[in-house]
């Protein structure tokens, strides 16, 4: 049968699993839990099964959901979905609105993902209403915003992202239609100039009829009205609304320039007595044509920048087949489906731990779980990078996002929804893209006052050329930009419009986020999760890498290679050691437990287990304490000390055991000692662990890049020296017998000496060092999350040490693109704005037209996004130098 548990819907949404043998609530739950049960179970429930158990999970989830509504911890950023951001000025305005709230400590705004991550001051009690009030302030400032609910189901999150992508695709289609309309008008405007060009070349065609009509000022005015109210309508209205909200953006600048040119032309047309001779209706048409074309190309490039994130999301299944089987069914448990089983299609958010699911060939696993029945091969390349499919049968684990290739499988859900492996990867990538690189502050500082500065420069440009420049440099009126009659008003207005239009805060606003988006998404796709732009920037500047030994340079799958004892049977020593280490999570502890299990040894009962990370584990067996760990630590646990002759004898026995076993230079050997209260050291256990295949390559590549490599280990000198020699780390950079505190201190000393340090580790004893290092890099053995991955800022989910080099290389390439983008954006504005203002006009007789300025403005943004897209061509170091 699939399950002997039945689920009952209760208000609020939760579930009860009942099993009669444990029906006595008073015995199952402490007082606090009983009060929660009474509070939530307002309706009576009835037993319809021959078993009763009240599952604690649903109550905990209900409790947590209620608490999440009441209060959000102040150190956890809330996420706001913000729409309407068009350029760097918009980003700066959104950040300014958020930071103006006294409760806000910091805010990071991402225009590409349309999100704002807000952190509050420690003394602030953050509630859902607090977040909603910030969203309301943004909406009132012209940027529609709403709080993203934390804990939202994975299907809901996928749906939300896909809706955003779909929305961008729809906008791209509309943008193309507007461009087609705008350039039709541009072609008609150009028609009036075509005859002049052909006549100047001696080709006397294109005159009369429609050509003469296109020269008519009223027709040109009509084309300008068509451009402003047709394809340019949304742009103009958005710019006007931004002015009204006191947050002008790029649309405001373009709209102001277009309307200024149109207004002056219209006044000149309807009031000929003014003798302005300022008819340049074609300028708003040409300007909008180039701007809209650039926007369309920019939107296409930004959509393409989300490709890697979309590929990650495509791995998540939002639907699943829940299998319901009768409790009295007698079908063999290894049968995929029984005759009376029912499959129900449900959202993956409705799946709970323990549910039975059916996954057919070609389908994606919706949750993490273990195989209950069936045989198949599974494509796990998205998680492991291994191209060959992996055989799965009863008892094997499967991960969400991997693909079932061959036969149907029935699985039992072990982690669901937002807790599944692929969901955690996606969430970490989203969080990473919300963490701005410190270099972004430069762009923010410039983009904030940018629009007002440009408007001021434009007004100054108009005033200078109209009142001063045209008199000091009269020859400038001979330039085509001044019109056929050399009009100072036409010259001044066009140069002022040039300044408005050529400036581009968009390039500044896109310089960092586009590169960060592509870099973090590409890293996640390749198997290394980088927790944000700030981490990328630090990672790119690393000049020293500290490596742990066990589980980092070695495979992390140690095995017992020898046991020696003093006065005890060897199996007796192994039994005691396994009993003590049973609850420990270190790979060495697991090796001892696995060895005892493989020999079918019955371990004694223990009490009061205590683990001291990096040293060993202590527990009480038969009324006496037994310690397992390093020699010094075990000796210090007990008053009775061993004679030196006993220790020499023990070492000799162990060496003899090891000499009879096959070993190679690629094996690292560690010795742990077993001590007992009142007796001292009673035995020693040798643990062997094979070096990783890519360990030597990784160290060599790091050293080739000029990065200092050091080895930090809590193991004995001999084992550490052997590993260091095999991988190529110098003896002076090898450190052994280090406690977690000593590792932490060593990292601090390296930083004090000026090094930027990355620490690579995998266990709980590495967590302090990972947190202290400039960048902590954690390997995830068998995709299990632990303290190391929680403390690290980079996680290697495929458990490949060579990905350390790849992550460093990607970070350097990403930051290189960021600096290139910022350099381009700043240089473009510094050079183009003075040229647009006419600085070259007196001496070189060169001036831009508004349409040329609009085209350059569009190209500046396209360059930034396209340059970031080149990151997708970046090759990993591993692929360049295949092992």
UniProtKB/Swiss-Prot annotation:
Gene3D superfamilies: 3.30.70.100, Calcium-transporting ATPase, cytoplasmic domain N, Calcium-transporting ATPase, cytoplasmic transduction domain A, HAD superfamily/HAD-like. Residues 76-146 form the HMA domain. The active site is at residue 548. GO terms for molecular function: ATP binding; ATP hydrolysis activity; copper ion transmembrane transporter activity; metal ion binding; P-type divalent copper transporter activity. Residues 1-65 form a transit peptide. It is an enzyme of class 7 (translocase). One of its GO terms (cellular component) is chloroplast thylakoid membrane. It holds the Pfam family Hydrolase. Keywords: ATP-binding, Chloroplast, Copper, Copper transport, Ion transport, Magnesium, Membrane, Metal-binding, Nucleotide-binding, Plastid, Thylakoid, Transit peptide, Translocase, Transmembrane, Transmembrane helix, Transport. The keyword Chloroplast applies. Expressed in the shoots only and not in the roots. It catalyses: Cu(2+)(in) + ATP + H2O = Cu(2+)(out) + ADP + phosphate + H(+). Its EC number is 7.2.2.9. Disruption phenotype: High-chlorophyll-fluorescence phenotype. Mg(2+) binds at residues 762, 766. The keyword ATP-binding applies. GO terms for biological process: copper ion transport; photosynthetic electron transport chain. ATP binds at residues 761-768. Belongs to the cation transport ATPase (P-type) (TC 3.A.3) family. Type IB subfamily. This is Copper-transporting ATPase PAA2, chloroplastic. It comes from Arabidopsis thaliana. The gene is PAA2.
């Amino acid at each position: 049968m699939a399950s002997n548990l039945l689920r009952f819907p209760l208000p609020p949404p939760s579930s009860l699993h009942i099993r009669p043998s444990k029906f006595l609530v008073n015995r199952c739950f402490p007082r606090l839990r009983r009060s929660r049960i009474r509070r939530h179970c307002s309706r009576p429930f009835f037993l319809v099964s021959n078993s009763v158990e009240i599952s604690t999970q649903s109550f905990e989830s209900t409790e947590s959901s209620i608490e999440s509504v009441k209060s959000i911890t102040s150190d956890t950023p809330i996420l706001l979905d913000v729409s309407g951001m068009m350029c760097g000025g918009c980003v700066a305005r959104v950040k300014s609105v958020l930071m103006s709230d006294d409760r806000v400590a910091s805010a990071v705004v991402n225009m590409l993902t349309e999100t704002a991550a807000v952190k509050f001051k420690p003394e602030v009690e953050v509630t859902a209403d607090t977040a909603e009030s910030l969203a309301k302030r943004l909406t009132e400032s012209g940027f529609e915003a709403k709080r993203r609910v934390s804990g939202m189901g994975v299907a809901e999150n996928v749906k939300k992202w896909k809706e955003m992508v779909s929305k961008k695709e729809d906008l791209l289609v509309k943008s193309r239609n507007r461009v087609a309309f705008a350039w039709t008008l541009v072609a008609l405007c150009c028609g009036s100039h075509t005859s002049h060009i052909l006549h100047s070349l001696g080709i006397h065609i294109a005159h009369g009829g429609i050509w003469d009509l296109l020269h008519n000022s009223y027709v040109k005015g009509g084309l300008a009205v068509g451009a402003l109210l047709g394809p340019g309508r949304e742009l103009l209205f958005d710019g006007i609304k931004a002015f009204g909200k006191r947050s002008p953006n790029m649309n405001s600048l373009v709209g102001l320039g277009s309307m200024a040119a149109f207004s002056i032309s219209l006044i000149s047309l309807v009031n000929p007595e003014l003798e302005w001779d300022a008819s340049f209706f074609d300028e708003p048409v040409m300007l909008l044509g180039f701007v809209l074309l650039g926007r369309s190309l920019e939107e296409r490039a930004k959509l393409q920048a989300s490709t890697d994130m979309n590929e990650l999301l495509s791995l998540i299944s939002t639907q699943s087949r829940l299998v319901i089987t009768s409790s009295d069914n007698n079908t063999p448990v290894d049968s995929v489906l029984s005759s009376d089983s029912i499959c129900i299609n449900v959202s993956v958010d409705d799946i709970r731990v323990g549910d039975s699911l059916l996954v057919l060939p070609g389908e994606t696993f919706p949750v993490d779980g273990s195989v209950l029945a069936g045989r198949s091969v599974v494509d796990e390349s998205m998680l492991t990078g291994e191209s060959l499919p992996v055989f799965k049968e009863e008892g094997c684990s499967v991960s969400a996002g991997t693909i079932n290739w061959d036969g149907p499988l029935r699985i039992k859900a072990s982690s669901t929804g937002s807790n599944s492996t692929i969901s955690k990867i996606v969430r970490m990538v989203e969080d990473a893209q919300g963490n701005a690189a410190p270099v972004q502050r430069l762009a923010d500082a410039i983009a904030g006052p940018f629009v007002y500065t440009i408007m001021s420069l434009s007004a100054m440009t108009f005033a200078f050329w109209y009142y001063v420049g045209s008199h000091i440099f009269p020859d400038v009126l001979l330039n085509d930009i001044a019109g056929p009659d050399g009009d100072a008003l036409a010259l001044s207005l066009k140069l002022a419009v040039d300044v408005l239009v050529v400036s581009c805060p968009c390039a500044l606003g896109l310089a960092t986020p586009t590169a960060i988006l592509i870099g973090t998404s590409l890293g996640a796709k390749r198997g290394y999760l980088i927790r944000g732009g700030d981490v990328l920037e630090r990672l790119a500047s690393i000049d020293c890498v500290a490596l742990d030994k066990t589980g980092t340079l070695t495979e992390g799958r140690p095995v017992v290679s020898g046991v020696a004892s003093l006065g005890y049977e060897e199996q007796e020593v192994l039994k005691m050691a396994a009993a003590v280490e049973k609850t420990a999570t270190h790979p060495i502890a697991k090796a001892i437990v696995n060895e005892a299990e493989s020999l079918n040894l019955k371990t004694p009962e223990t009490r009061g287990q205590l683990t001291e990370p990096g040293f060993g584990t202590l527990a009480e067996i038969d009324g006496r304490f037994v310690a397992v760990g390093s020699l010094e630590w075990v000796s210090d646990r007990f008053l009775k000390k061993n004679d030196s002759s006993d220790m020499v004898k023990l070492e000799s026995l162990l060496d003899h055991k090891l000499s009879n076993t096959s070993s190679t230079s690629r094996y690292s050997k560690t010795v742990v000692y077993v001590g007992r209260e009142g007796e001292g050291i009673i035995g020693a256990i040798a643990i062997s662990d094979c070096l990783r295949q890519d360990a030597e390559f990784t160290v060599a590549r790091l050293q080739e890049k000029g990065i200092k490599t050091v080895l930090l280990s809590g193991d004995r000198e001999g084992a550490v020296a052997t590993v260091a020699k095999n991988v190529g780390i110098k003896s002076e950079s090898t450190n052994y017998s280090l406690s977690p505190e000593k590792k932490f201190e060593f990292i601090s000393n390296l930083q004090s000496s000026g090094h930027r340090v990355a620490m690579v580790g995998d266990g709980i004893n590495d967590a302090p060092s990972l947190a202290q290092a400039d960048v902590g890099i954690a390997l995830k053995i068998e995709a299990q999350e632990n303290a190391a991955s929680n403390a690290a800022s980079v996680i290697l989910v495929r458990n490949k040490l060579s990905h350390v080099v790849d992550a460093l290389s990607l970070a350097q390439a990403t930051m290189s693109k960021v600096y290139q983008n910022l350099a381009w954006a700043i240089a473009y504005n510094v050079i183009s704005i003075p040229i647009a203002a006419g600085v070259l006009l007196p001496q070189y007789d060169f001036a831009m037209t508004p349409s040329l300025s609009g085209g350059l403005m569009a190209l500046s943004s396209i360059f930034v996004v396209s340059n970031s897209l080149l990151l997708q061509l970046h090759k990993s170091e591993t692929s360049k130098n295949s092992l």
